[in-house]
Design a protein with these regions (language model features):
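Cytoplasmic helix-loop-helix junction between adjacent transmembrane helices
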Residues: 128-167
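Juxtamembrane intracellular "pre-TM" segments in multi-pass secondary transporters
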Residues: 17-28, 225-256, 281
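Helix-breaking motifs and short loop linkers at transmembrane-helix boundaries and internal kinks
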Residues: 64, 97, 118-123, 152, ...
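Helix-loop-helix hairpin linking two adjacent transmembrane segments in secondary transporters
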Residues: 163-222
Length: 430
């Protein structure tokens, strides 16, 4: 296996590197400010999809959609299209200016979100959802590649952990924020222009979620990277070098990709339906669900990250580099036990308690996965290696929302039929 080596502020990739060492890293202040902006982008990118998941019921009613069609939006348009886009985008991450590529993708997903909000048919929703997926597919490969161009190797784990925490907490914050936006859009007291104010609340909420895009694009182009990083990205390793790397490290990569990918897909894919299940089974409102899940999930994720850090330190002395996989195995076992119990939950309090437990366990399981991929991949292949990992996760994830929708339409009926479908899909994949 090849590993980057840092000495004197420069990085040299062993065996596979065909490029000269890069120059100095940006100042610590510039690097941490850049990381802060990347964290904000993670939150913003997830906001539109969180709103879509929260407004499934009014969206269905507005356009007379079935659960299968909603599942197709989440499974195929938003997820499978990401799988088709992530490898070409991962290749671009290693070949073009990474900051310009990220700025272009912000513009794509923002414009597509507005198009989704204004769509009048399932076909229109599907097409613009594909645009959202393409724009956001670049985030995984590019974020962790940029971290390696902003921080020296001895800071990677810390920066990765902060990015992971931001991604997890940002996801729950965006869920709570999405609920707040939906409440504002439906209040009737909005100060929006009449042309927008007359739209359905779910459409208004999606449009509001894109308002920060121009500022974020400008700030993205101002991120400082180490000197020469852009040049190296434009002259990255060949496809032959990528195949050689995968063949030499196949056993380790298969374990990492499949292990973390299946765990994420089993829970993340089916979880897209969770807000709708609470609306049908317990009569909860989208605003209440978004805020409550955001707060509970954020707290559970924070405790999960803290527990993961403590466990990692203790386990590493015993099992060494196998630590992330051992942690994932135990956390997955706990998730398997917690998921079916949701069918027995008598009220929202019990559901939210189980949701907190699952979120805690998933955070423990997945919190170290970015650092594992980053350390496995040499610099000039990093974007594509991370993209392959993302591709495998997305392939596993893509069928979950559609499968839940089909089961809800055909096999499980009644107020808790959707929750039963979620449990079957989540537990079956684990």
């Amino acid at each position: 296996m090849t590993h980057p080596d840092t000495e004197g502020g420069q990085e040299t990739d062993l065996a596979l590197s065909a490029s000269a060492p890069l120059g100095r890293y940006p100042s610590p202040l510039a690097a941490w400010l850049g990381l802060a902006l990347l964290c904000i982008l993670m939150l913003t990118a997830g906001l539109n999809q969180q709103i879509i998941f929260l407004v499934v019921e009014p969206l269905k009613e507005s356009l007379s959609l079935s659960d299968t069609q909603i599942g197709a939006l989440g499974g195929f348009a938003l997820t499978l299209v990401s799988a088709l886009a992530i490898l070409p985008l991962g290749w671009l991450v290693d070949r073009v200016n990474r900051l310009r590529l990220l700025a272009a993708c912000i513009a794509i997903w923002s414009a597509s979100t507005v198009g989704f909000a204004l769509a009048q048919s399932f076909e229109g929703l599907f097409g613009f959802a594909m645009g959202i997926a393409v724009g956001e597919a670049v985030l995984g490969p590019i974020m962790y590649s940029l971290i390696a161009d902003m921080f020296p190797r001895d800071k990677w784990v810390r920066a990765n952990l902060i990015m992971y925490i931001a991604g997890r907490l940002g996801g729950f914050a965006s869920l709570a924020f999405a609920g707040t936006i939906i409440g504002f859009a439906g209040s009737g007291d909005s100060v929006l222009p009449p042309l927008i104010a007359q739209l359905d609340p779910w459409r208004i909420a999606l449009i509001i979620s894109t308002l920060t895009a121009p500022v974020l694009i400008i700030l993205t182009l101002m991120i400082r990277l180490r000197s020469g990083a852009t040049v190296k990205a434009q002259t990255g390793g060949t496809s032959q070098g990528l195949f050689i790397y995968f063949r030499a490290n196949a056993r380790a990569l298969v374990g990492v990709f499949l292990g973390f990918g299946i765990v994420f897909a089993a829970n993340g894919g089916a979880a897209a339906w969770f807000p709708a299940a609470l609306q049908r089974g317990f009569g909860a409102k989208p605003t209440e669900i978004g805020v409550t899940m955001g707060i509970i999930g954020g707290c559970a994720a924070a405790f999960g990250v803290a527990a993961a850090a403590l466990l990692e330190r203790w386990l590493r002395r015993k099992v060494g580099d196998l630590t992330p996989m051992v942690m994932a195995q135990f956390a997955t076992a706990g998730t398997i036990l917690a998921t079916p119990v949701m069918l027995l939950a008598p009220d929202l309090t019990a559901i939210y308690t189980l949701y907190a437990a699952k979120t805690f366990l998933l955070t423990v399981c997945l919190s170290l996965s970015p650092a594992v991929l980053q350390m496995l991949a040499p610099s000039h292949l990093r974007g594509r290696v991370i993209a392959v990992g993302g591709l495998i996760t997305i392939i596993f994830s893509s069928m979950a929302p559609l499968t839940v929708g089909v089961l809800s339409d055909t096999a499980f009926h009644g107020p808790k039929g959707l929750m039963a479908s979620i449990v079957v899909v989540s537990t079956g994949r684990l």
